[in-house]
Amino acid sequence: MSSLRPDEARKLATAASVSPLSNCQFCGVVISSIADEQKLEFTNKYKGSCTLLCSYDSQGVVLRVVSDDDRSHVLKEYMIAADTDAAQMGRRSYAVSLDADNLVLRFGSEQDQQLFRKVVENVKHLRPKSVFSQRTEESSASQYFQFYGYLSQQQNMMQDYVRTSTYQRAILGNAVDFQDKIVLDVGAGSGILSFFAVQAGAAKVYAIEASNMAQYAQQLVESNNVQHKISVIPGKIEEIELPEKVDVIISEPMGYMLYNERMLETYLHARKWLKPQGKMYPTHGDLHIAPFSDESLYSEQYNKANFWYQSAFHGVDLTTLHKEGMKEYFRQPIVDTFDIRICMAKSVRHVCDFLNDKEDDLHLISIPLEFHILQTGICHGLAFWFDVEFSGSSQNVWLSTSPTAPLTHWYQVRCLLPMPIFIKQGQTLTGRVLLEANRRQSYDVTIDLHIEGTLISSSNTLDLKNPYFRYTGAPVQAPPGTSTQSPSEQYWTQVDTQGSRNSSSMLNGGLSVNGIGDGMDITHGLMHPH
């Protein structure tokens, strides 16, 4: 699959790293094996001519050999890496050693041979590791791109109505920022944001996607007849080259707690392609942090860890692992949603400016905390959520993951303290949250809290890479003790009031059902008590 026109491919071929030129195909190639190196005798490896499919890979270029007659069946797959031995043979042939095969590739034209030679040379002259590769473990990157290469994962994000509709509204509501402009979509996935940019009048969109989802994005581009507007470029923004600067960068780089997956660094890195005074969509992000009280959640995690406190589990004493089990469970951030009334103080806001902050600023994020406690109770930890703003020329649009806003696939995140602290209304809770980036595309989160004027403090370090997904889909329950009137009496008062109204309607032709009245929904009070 070639996602670039030949002229664009040649422009990108100047990249010092593996460029989008590496995603192309060569038809009518005759492949021979070297049977005798001394006599230079060759034998045809495959019957008839073949097609070579080249595709970008983090290690180089994957070369797939398929028959010209049946491209659905892969005859052989090779990896062209930096240490691959290769040499030109005449004007149309190329010798290459791949795995245990010494091959001669005879191309259908000189141009094809030159283009393939360029593919190999690009791999052999790779730049030093990109910024992304330096900060990311290979296993983590592989898992990450494999995850986002599944259509089901893209569907999960696309079906987040709040997320997708907010992006579309922000882009279409600021069409002046996109009309006849050059746009860069970072981590394009299915390309949905690129399509929104075209809907807003963009002249050209470069959609960068490092996972296998790039091939599906290309299919969508072609089936929607916008290939003249959207160029899908497989690869990482840290490694590819663009033929020009852009007016606008769009992306959806937010993870749990805003920073998880470290995609924000990639988003900031993309600014190297942004023209002066260019736009970023979104423009900045606010991370909100608040202390919370939730005895049920704390007990749930604590009781899980107590599994390891058994001294006779099928005749085996597990207690030696109890301490480690407790530590592991409390190192897990909890991803779910909650009633904001569990928060004991107004949230502290930490701002990330996508237009001006540097990548390095996100390697170690230190957030000072000061909370003025609004209600007496036990603080079990800190709750996190984020908002992002799209600052456009026509209007500003916000996307919120607050517990007071419609639920999104980001939910909210809570980090527990192994040792909760009792705190009174009017006291001040101070401390710090430290987010330390790691090579697993995530953060180690350290929380330190202290009640001002006392010796009471508590701390914990959590692994944001290993969250506990607790959300069940059940309605959020109000915190215990928030009812100021009898819920039973409230409900029956509501029934009496509704019944009285329906009795009045009967005089105008309404019907009575069991003496209650026509059209009355008696479940409403049960489901939504005031």
Swiss-Prot record:
Principal localization? cytoplasm
Instruction: Name the Enzyme Commission number(s) assigned to this protein.
Output: 2.1.1.319
Could you tell me where this protein is found in the cell? Cytoplasm; Nucleus
Is Ligase tagged as a keyword? no
**What do the Gene Ontology cellular component annotations say?**
cytoplasm; cytosol; histone methyltransferase complex; nucleus
Q: Per the record, what are the reactions this protein catalyses?
A: L-arginyl-[protein] + 2 S-adenosyl-L-methionine = N(omega),N(omega)-dimethyl-L-arginyl-[protein] + 2 S-adenosyl-L-homocysteine + 2 H(+)
Supply the Gene3D superfamilies for this chain: Hnrnp arginine n-methyltransferase1 (2.70.160.11), Pleckstrin-homology domain (PH domain)/Phosphotyrosine-binding domain (PTB) (2.30.29.30), Vaccinia Virus protein VP39 (3.40.50.150)
Q: Does the keyword Protein transport apply?
A: no
Q: How is it modified after translation?
A: The dimethylated protein is the major form.
Which keywords are on file for this protein? Chromatin regulator, Cytoplasm, Methylation, Methyltransferase, Nucleus, S-adenosyl-L-methionine, Transcription, Transcription regulation, Transferase
Residues bearing Asymmetric dimethylarginine? R501
Q: Name one Pfam family in it.
A: PrmA
Q: What does this protein do?
A: Methylates (mono- and asymmetric dimethylation) the guanidino nitrogens of arginyl residues in proteins. May methylate histone H3 at 'Arg-17' and activate transcription via chromatin remodeling.
* Protein's name in the database: Histone-arginine methyltransferase CARMER
Organism expressing this protein natively: Drosophila simulans
Q: Which gene encodes it?
A: Art4
